[in-house]
């Protein structure tokens, strides 16, 4: 009997609950050709959109969604008036060049203020320092200048190295030519001694 009841029960899926399978079987038995719209409306979910908007987007809160009423950058206030804008810039440039020329003429005889102040301040600082601190400062300034001049030193070293290599190449070429000439003279000397020996042999015989 247990086997017969097990065969009569419908097969259930893992994710379905008991009520959904039995209700669907009963509904299909009662309404074999029920409307699809009714079945979809039972399964579908309706959202209360106004409630969602009121909950998640209240009118009195912006949640960081501020609206900025500024123009996009770069902003030119005279974009509409092209003719006026050109004449304004020309007038401004003419005034700026005139005032700049006057300022340059007035400043020609003057020494720069920042250099004079810098020299005075360094003298005052040195007088306040102890001899040990002055020596440390002098060494620091010397190391700093060496560090800043290191790029120049590297360039000079490269030039000297390339010059030495070029000079070495010239010396090697001169040695090779001198060695070649000495070889030629030795060969000619050996040839002459061989001919002398042959002449001596011919005379003696």
From Swiss-Prot:
Xref: InterPro entries: PPI-2
Modified residues (Phosphothreonine): 73
Stretches for region Required for binding PPP1CC: 12-17, 43-55
Pfam families per record: IPP-2
Protein name listed in UniProt: Putative protein phosphatase inhibitor 2-like protein 1
Gene3D superfamilies: 6.10.250.1050
Organism: Homo sapiens (Human)
Cysteine pairs bridged by disulfides in the record: none
Modified sites of kind Phosphoserine: 87
Single annotated GO MF: protein phosphatase inhibitor activity
Acidic residues: compositionally biased ranges: 80-91, 121-130
The entry's keywords: Carbohydrate metabolism, Glycogen metabolism, Phosphoprotein, Protein phosphatase inhibitor
């Amino acid at each position: 009997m247990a086997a017969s009841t097990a065969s009569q029960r419908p097969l259930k899926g893992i994710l379905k609950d008991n009520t959904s399978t039995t209700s669907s079987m009963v509904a299909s038995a009662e309404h074999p050709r029920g409307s699809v719209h009714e079945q979809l409306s039972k399964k579908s979910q309706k959202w209360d959109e106004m409630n969602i908007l009121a909950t998640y987007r209240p009118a009195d809160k912006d949640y960081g969604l501020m609206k900025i009423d500024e123009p996009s950058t770069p902003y030119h206030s005279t974009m509409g008036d092209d003719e006026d804008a050109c004449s304004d810039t020309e007038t401004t440039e003419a005034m700026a060049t005139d005032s700049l020329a006057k300022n340059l003429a007035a400043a020609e005889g003057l020494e720069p203020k920042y250099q004079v102040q810098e020299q005075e301040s360094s003298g005052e600082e040195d007088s306040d320092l102890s001899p040990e601190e002055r020596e440390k400062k002098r060494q620091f300034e010397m190391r700093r200048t060496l560090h800043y001049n290191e790029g120049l030193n590297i360039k000079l070293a490269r030039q000297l190295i390339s010059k030495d290599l070029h000079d070495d190449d010239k010396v090697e070429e001169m040695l090779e030519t001198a060695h070649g000439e000495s070889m030629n003279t030795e060969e000619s000397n050996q040839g002459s001694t061989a001919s002398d020996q042959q002449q001596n042999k011919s005379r003696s015989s």
